[in-house]
């Protein structure tokens, strides 16, 4: 286990904020984590980070930052049709996807190149191109921060919805994910109906590796590489509005894209709303709206978290003014 004081969080946030944690703790097993918690009633306030691809630090963190280095992948169940694989929370998400594809297992390929770690995938319910982590997750193994007890959550207990889970809501900050068990298919099954995957494949017969590479190309074309330009992926969630509000908006803006969701509600791409407000490529100080995807805010170099937040607020205000729609951050602001 590693414990550091006044530790730079630069490698732990893709926005590139050079902030410090008063204490930083990295553990590489459940036993190390529970051992640390047993001896440290002073663990609060605390924040658990993964790859930091969905975090915006606006100041130094005065408490304890925890990071999992729990690695490993273990097959825990298998039939002719599927395989259940239990993965350590500290594994890099895209390494897991690459591994699944190399093994010939179906289900994770549309989630290629999403930054971050496996533990966060189960908290955030990451998603792309018509697939969400919740579609693959069977169990989430956790440790309770207060009691140090282990608890396994079945998929249904995680209350998953679009970019939401019980770990972000009712149980926020209460449980640490240590392992996630995914069920992947052994028989060919692709989701190619979303976005331009089909077009990117160019009529070729889909294969696991082919779909993975198509998704990687699409993402690289639209989303900035955090190593080159600090960012947290989509800064806002796509708003979901009641049908009546959508109808009224569609009358005024007939070309507005939309996706119907449960309960007769409609999801509108926040990127389109922001784009229509004229923000694409605009900046305030060293914080900018990415020129190729308006949903992404970028650090042009040396921006503070507060500067990024100011830009985010200005963007959200103009969307509210023009469309009457509230957009909420997907990124966690600390
Ligand atoms: N659009 C614009 N202008 C823009 C951006 C988008 O007009 O600047 C329009 C597009 O033309 C399209 C629609 O908005 O009609 C949706 O855009 P896109 O397909 O790029 O997807 P998104 O809704 O912007 C979501 C996820 C992404 C995920 C993609 C693909 C959220 C908040 N974001 O983006 O996830 O990769 O779909 O499935 O749901 C992330 O969460 O960090 C992330 C990148």
Where does each model-flagged region fall?
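Phosphate/pyrophosphate-binding loops and the adjoining catalytic core of nucleotide-dependent enzymes
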Residues: 315
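Phosphate/pyrophosphate- and phosphate-bearing ligand-binding catalytic cores of soluble enzymes
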Residues: 4-5, 10-14, 55, 150-306, ...
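Anion-binding (especially nucleotide phosphate/pyrophosphate-binding) glycine-rich loop
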Residues: 1-147
């Amino acid at each position: 286990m590693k414990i550091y004081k006044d530790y730079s969080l630069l490698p732990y946030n893709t926005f590139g904020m050079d902030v410090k944690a008063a204490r930083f703790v990295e553990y590489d097993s459940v036993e190390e984590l529970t051992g640390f918690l047993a001896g440290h009633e002073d663990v609060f306030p605390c924040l658990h980070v993964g790859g930091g691809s969905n975090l915006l630090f606006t100041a130094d963190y005065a408490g304890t930052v925890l990071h999992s280095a729990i690695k490993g992948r273990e097959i825990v169940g298998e039939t002719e049709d599927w395989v259940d694989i239990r993965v350590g929370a500290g594994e890099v998400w895209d390494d897991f996807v690459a591994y699944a594809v190399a093994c010939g297992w179906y289900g994770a390929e549309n989630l290629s190149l999403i930054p971050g770690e496996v533990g966060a995938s189960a908290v955030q319910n990451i998603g792309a191109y018509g697939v969400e982590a919740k579609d693959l997750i069977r169990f989430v193994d956790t440790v309770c921060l207060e009691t140090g007890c282990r608890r396994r959550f079945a998929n249904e207990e995680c209350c998953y919805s679009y970019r939401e889970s019980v770990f972000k809501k009712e149980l926020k900050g209460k449980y640490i994910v240590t392992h996630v068990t995914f069920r992947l298919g052994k028989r060919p099954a692709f989701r190619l109906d979303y976005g331009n995957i089909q077009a990117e494949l160019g009529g070729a017969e889909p294969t696991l590796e082919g779909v993975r590479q198509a998704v990687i190309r699409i993402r690289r074309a639209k989303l900035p590489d955090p190593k080159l330009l600090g960012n947290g992926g989509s800064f806002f969630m796509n708003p979901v509005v009641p049908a009546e509000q959508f109808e009224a908006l569609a009358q005024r803006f007939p070309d507005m894209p939309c996706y119907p969701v449960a309960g007769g509600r409609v999801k509108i791409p926040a990127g389109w709303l922001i784009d229509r407000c004229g923000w694409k490529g605009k900046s305030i100080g060293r914080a900018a709206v990415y020129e190729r995807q308006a949903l992404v805010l970028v650090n042009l170099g040396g921006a503070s978290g507060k500067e990024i937040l100011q830009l985010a607020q200005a963007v959200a205000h103009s969307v509210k003014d023009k469309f009457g729609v509230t957009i909420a951050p997907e990124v966690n602001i600390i």
